[in-house]
Structure formats: structure tokens, C-alpha cells
């Protein structure tokens, strides 16, 4: 019986230990990190979806709906195209000698002069747009033996007939149209753009009535190039009461070169030249209104902020713009891995460290300490490790923007039907570039997110190791991000651990003494299990012995009779 009582006592000791941290001679210190109830999912190299405490959207998916007029100089074409303004269509005279960073063409733009075509329309439009000016210099061309300043009722300038202000329509004088041969040297130090044309009458009668000869010819040349155009006489669809046409051509004369014009009819002569400039001006088709505001990036949909590295508003852009990508969203992690805090902590509200979960409500830092000692419980952030992580993360967004935002413009591409295959090839190249950039963007963000999560995890581990090195043998790692401190550690002591001034030698003797005393009573879970099993086995054995003894005693007294048959 004494043995049973002794074993029962040991069993009670094994199960009746005090909870860690409840002894006034010890304390518990846990390390943890910030957490939020609902984090943001981001993509990394190793995970398609991983939850973080905070993330920043990198794709701009909407515009302001208006074009800002600052810092770029915006020229609203209103109802004029750039080429009409270049030629001097009467209703576009307000654009003479204008300059711009971005010329905005509207869908309502129309021509209101002699019907014309430009065989290389896209190139001329792009050339003039990039020059950023319609500055025109009149030159004294001498046209002998012909009538100048021809006009048409299809091109009204005021009440009377008119013509393009930058072109001079030459017709016969009397009954003759002599061969014209005019030269104009470029003695300046800049390129000169000459616009000229060829008239295509609708009938042979119109041809001879204007130019005498049954067929004219126009040749314009420089030392670098030559163009010879033969008029195509024939009826075309009626436009503004005319079935004849004018074809517009252009020639660039370099400094030191000479412009030579030779013709025996059908010449639409230049009146001077446009001064060419090099720059990054451009043109854009858009119906977005122009407003007084500031934006570096402009799309046909309107201006967009350029504080993000990517956008999927429009492929066509002007200014310092985010790269166009196909994704609607790409999120950059700007916080750490999120592990929401568990609502229950077991018996008596025990605290836990970062290995189990994060801590919600820690608003003054990303990393911190929680403690439980004789004075109660408390929490404080570790600002040094928090700042170290923030400093490295803050530069990520700016670095991504610097890598992707460039001051360039993606212009619209136009090709004639003859160049359909070139257009298809160009579209394929553009689509491939977008696919490549979209893939690169996703990969770049995934890499940065992986680095951010690894970085924040590393800072947590650094703080834990720093605390471990301070405490040394004065505390025991509990395996969940917490330390059990084997000496009395009040709030001042806890603060010294947090700020790195803790002196473990001061508490060493007390910690060792308490550790031995506690270990003498506390039984580790492994030994406790062994003792429980041994106690159970011995108790069962003694119970069997007592039962067997009772049976033998009863048999001797005759109370029980046992017959054995063979």
C-alpha cells in the first residue's frame, strides 16, 4: 500500500507542474512580427500566391480622361489635321508658324480645300510631328512665263476662290506653258523641308486648258535624291465638286545641297520651306479634352500618372510613361509575410512567438517583443530592425520605376494598302514586344517579392539570434519564438534585453540556481512520459499480486474451491 501511495505521489508531481512563466522567479520573453487580419496576395518565384501584410499595385489601369497641358506644350488640332495645317488649308490658317510638343488630332478633323492625297502620308506626318513646328520661310522662286496663284471654288478663302497658302498653283500664261527650271540652294546650317505637288486633271480637255501640253512632267531633285512624276489624267470620285486630284510630295534639302525643280506642266510649286528641327515632339489621335493640369504621361485616353512602372491603359503614349503590359494587376510586396494571429492561446492566455504566428495590433513597428513577468505582460516594437527592413524595401518601387519609365513616345503606325505585309509584320513585332515586356514585368515583380519576403524573414531571425546571444544560459529557447528566463526579470530587465544593454553575468548565478531548483521539480516531457508508463506498469503488477493473494487466501479458508481436471 505504501508503494501505491508513493507512485501516486510521483504521478501527481508529474502532472501537477506550474505553467511556465507563472513563477515570480522566472519570466517569458517572446519575439514576433507584425500581422494583419486580412493580408494581400502576391506572386513570388516559388509561390503563385503568398500572403503579405502590405503590397503596392504596380499597374496603372485608368486615365484621368483629359489631356494635361503641362509640362508638355499641347497643340489642339481642333478640326484640322497636321497635314492640312502644313499645306495651309484656309480653315487651318490659325496654325501657321505654331510649335508643339504634342499635336492632338481630333476625329472631327476635315479637309476643306482642293482634294489631295499624299503617297507617303505617314512618313510626312511623322516627320513634321517630330519637328514640332510649322515655322515657314517664304523664298523668292522665279516662275517665268506662267500664271501663278491659281485657285479653286473648292477651296474658299473668304468670299472668293483660294488655294493652299503654302503652295503655288502654276498654270499657262496666255497659250504657253514653258519648261520651268528653277534652282534653290540651301546656304543655311539646318535642313529645309519643301512641299510640292502634281495636279492630276480629270479630263484631257482640263489638262490642255490649264497646261497646254497633253501631258506634263514634274522632276524635283537634289544631290541625294530625284523624283519624277507623270500626271495621271482621269476622273475620280467627286469631292467638293471636283473629280481631279493633287498629289503632295516632299523633299528635304540638307545644308550645302541644292533643290532643282524642272517641269513642263502640272506643277504645284512650293512658296518656301519649313525649318526642320530635331526633337521628341509627336502627334496623337485623341478626343480627350485638354485641361489645365500637370502630367508627364499622355495617352489617347487621357493623361495618366507615372508613379507606377506599368500601365495597361493604351499602347500609344507620349512622355515619361510606364511601360505597357497586358496584365491588369501586378502587386509588389512592401510588407512581410503575413501570418494572422490565432484567436486562442491555450490555458491562461499564454503568449507565443513568431514561429507560431504574427501579432496583430503592433502598429509602431514590424518586429517586437512581448513579455510576461511578475509585473504582468507588455509589448514593445524593435525600431532598429523595423527601420532596417523598411529602408531596403522603400527603394524597391523607385528602382522598378527607374528601370521601366523612359522618356519616349510610342507613335501610331500607318501603312498604305500596298504595304499591308509590312503592317502585319510591324504588328507582329509590336505584339511580341508587349508579350516580352509583360513576361519581364511579371518576372521582375516576382523576383522583388521573393527578395522582400526573404529579407523580412531574415531580419526576424537576426533579432532572435541577437536576443539569444544576450541571454545565453540565463534562458531557454522554448521552440516557438519565446525564451524562458530563469531569473526574476522585471520591466527594466526586459527593456535592457530589448535595447541590447542586458548583462547576463549579473543574473547568471540566480539563473543557474533557479534552473537547478526548477529542473529538480519540473520533469521534462520525455522523462515524465517514462515515469508515467513505469508507474502504470508497477500499479498493474501490484494490483495483480493483490488479486492473486486474495484468491489464495480465500482458497485456504475454504471460501473458494478450485478443481483442476486433466
Swiss-Prot record:
GO terms for cellular component: host cell plasma membrane; membrane; viral envelope; virion membrane. The keyword Glycoprotein applies. The record marks 345-346 as: Cleavage. Changing residue 501 to N: In strain: Isolate MA20C, Isolate MA20, Isolate MA12. Keywords: Clathrin- and caveolin-independent endocytosis of virus by host, Clathrin-mediated endocytosis of virus by host, Disulfide bond, Fusion of virus membrane with host endosomal membrane, Fusion of virus membrane with host membrane, Glycoprotein, Hemagglutinin, Host cell membrane, Host membrane, Host-virus interaction, Lipoprotein, Membrane, Palmitate, Signal, Transmembrane, Transmembrane helix, Viral attachment to host cell, Viral envelope protein, Viral penetration into host cytoplasm, Virion, Virus endocytosis by host, Virus entry into host cell. Glycans are attached at residues 24, 38, 54, 97, 181, 301, 499. GO terms for molecular function: host cell surface receptor binding. Its main location: virion. Pfam families: Hemagglutinin. GO terms for biological process: clathrin-dependent endocytosis of virus by host cell; fusion of virus membrane with host endosome membrane; fusion of virus membrane with host plasma membrane; viral budding from plasma membrane; virion attachment to host cell. Gene3D superfamilies: 3.90.20.10, 3.90.209.20. A lipid is attached at residues 555, 562, 565 (S-palmitoyl cysteine). Residues 552-566 are cytoplasmic. Residues 1-16 form the signal peptide. Palmitoylated. It comes from the Viruses. Binds to sialic acid-containing receptors on the cell surface, bringing about the attachment of the virus particle to the cell. This attachment induces virion internalization either through clathrin-dependent endocytosis or through clathrin- and caveolin-independent pathway. Plays a major role in the determination of host range restriction and virulence. Class I viral fusion protein. Responsible for penetration of the virus into the cell cytoplasm by mediating the fusion of the membrane of the endocytosed virus particle with the endosomal membrane. Major glycoprotein, comprises over 80% of the envelope proteins present in virus particle. Belongs to the influenza viruses hemagglutinin family. This is Hemagglutinin.
Amino acid at each position: 500500500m505504501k508503494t501505491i501511495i508513493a507512485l501516486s505521489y510521483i504521478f501527481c508531481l508529474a502532472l501537477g507542474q506550474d505553467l511556465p512563466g507563472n513563477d515570480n522567479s522566472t519570466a517569458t520573453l517572446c519575439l514576433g512580427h507584425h500581422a494583419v487580419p486580412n493580408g494581400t496576395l502576391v506572386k513570388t518565384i516559388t509561390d503563385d500566391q503568398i500572403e503579405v501584410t502590405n503590397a503596392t499595385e504596380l499597374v496603372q489601369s485608368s486615365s484621368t480622361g483629359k489631356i494635361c497641358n503641362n509640362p508638355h506644350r499641347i497643340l489642339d488640332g481642333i478640326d484640322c489635321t497636321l497635314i492640312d495645317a502644313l499645306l495651309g488649308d484656309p480653315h487651318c490658317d490659325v496654325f501657321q508658324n505654331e510649335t508643339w510638343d504634342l499635336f492632338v488630332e481630333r476625329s472631327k478633323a476635315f479637309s476643306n480645300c482642293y482634294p489631295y492625297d499624299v503617297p507617303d502620308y505617314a512618313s510626312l506626318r511623322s516627320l513634321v510631328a517630330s519637328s514640332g513646328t510649322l515655322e515657314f520661310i517664304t523664298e523668292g522662286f522665279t516662275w517665268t512665263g506662267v500664271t501663278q496663284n491659281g485657285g479653286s471654288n473648292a477651296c474658299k478663302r473668304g468670299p472668293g476662290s483660294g488655294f493652299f497658302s503654302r503652295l503655288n498653283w502654276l498654270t499657262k500664261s496666255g497659250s504657253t506653258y514653258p519648261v520651268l527650271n528653277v534652282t534653290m540652294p540651301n546656304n543655311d546650317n539646318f535642313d529645309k523641308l519643301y512641299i510640292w505637288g502634281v495636279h492630276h486633271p480629270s479630263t484631257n480637255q482640263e489638262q490642255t486648258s490649264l497646261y497646254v501640253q497633253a501631258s506634263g512632267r514634274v522632276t524635283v531633285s537634289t544631290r541625294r535624291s530625284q523624283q519624277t512624276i507623270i500626271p495621271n489624267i482621269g476622273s475620280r470620285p467627286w469631292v467638293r465638286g471636283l473629280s481631279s486630284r493633287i498629289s503632295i510630295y516632299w523633299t528635304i534639302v540638307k545644308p550645302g545641297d541644292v533643290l532643282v525643280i524642272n517641269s513642263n506642266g502640272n506643277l504645284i510649286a512650293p512658296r518656301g520651306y519649313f525649318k526642320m528641327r530635331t526633337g521628341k515632339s509627336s502627334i496623337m489621335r485623341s478626343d480627350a479634352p485638354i485641361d489645365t493640369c500637370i502630367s508627364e504621361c499622355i495617352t489617347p485616353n487621357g493623361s495618366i500618372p507615372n508613379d507606377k512602372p506599368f500601365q495597361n491603359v493604351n499602347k500609344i503614349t507620349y512622355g515619361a510613361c510606364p511601360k505597357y503590359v497586358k496584365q491588369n494587376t501586378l502587386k509588389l510586396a512592401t510588407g512581410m509575410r503575413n501570418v494572422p494571429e490565432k484567436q486562442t492561446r491555450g490555458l491562461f492566455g499564454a503568449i507565443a512567438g513568431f514561429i507560431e504566428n504574427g501579432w496583430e495590433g503592433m502598429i509602431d513597428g514590424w518586429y517586437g517583443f512581448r513579455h510576461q513577468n511578475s509585473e504582468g505582460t507588455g509589448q514593445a516594437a524593435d525600431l532598429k530592425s523595423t527601420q532596417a527592413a523598411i529602408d531596403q524595401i522603400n527603394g524597391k518601387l523607385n528602382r522598378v520605376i527607374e528601370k521601366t519609365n523612359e522618356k519616349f513616345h510610342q507613335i501610331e503606325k500607318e501603312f498604305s494598302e500596298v504595304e499591308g505585309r509590312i503592317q502585319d509584320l510591324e504588328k507582329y513585332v509590336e505584339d511580341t514586344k508587349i508579350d516580352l515586356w509583360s513576361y519581364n514585368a511579371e518576372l521582375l515583380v516576382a523576383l522583388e517579392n521573393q527578395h522582400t519576403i526573404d529579407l523580412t524573414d531574415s531580419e526576424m531571425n537576426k533579432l532572435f539570434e541577437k536576443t539569444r546571444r544576450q541571454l545565453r544560459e540565463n534562458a531557454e529557447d522554448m521552440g516557438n519564438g519565446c525564451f524562458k528566463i530563469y531569473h526574476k526579470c522585471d520591466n527594466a530587465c526586459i527593456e535592457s534585453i530589448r535595447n541590447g544593454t542586458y548583462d547576463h553575468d549579473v543574473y547568471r548565478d540566480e539563473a543557474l540556481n533557479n534552473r537547478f531548483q526548477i529542473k529538480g521539480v519540473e520533469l521534462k516531457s520525455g522523462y515524465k512520459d517514462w515515469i508515467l508508463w513505469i508507474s502504470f506498469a508497477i500499479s498493474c503488477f501490484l494490483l495483480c499480486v493483490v488479486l492473486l493473494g486474495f484468491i489464495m487466501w480465500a482458497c485456504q479458508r475454504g471460501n473458494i474451491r478450485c478443481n483442476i481436471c486433466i
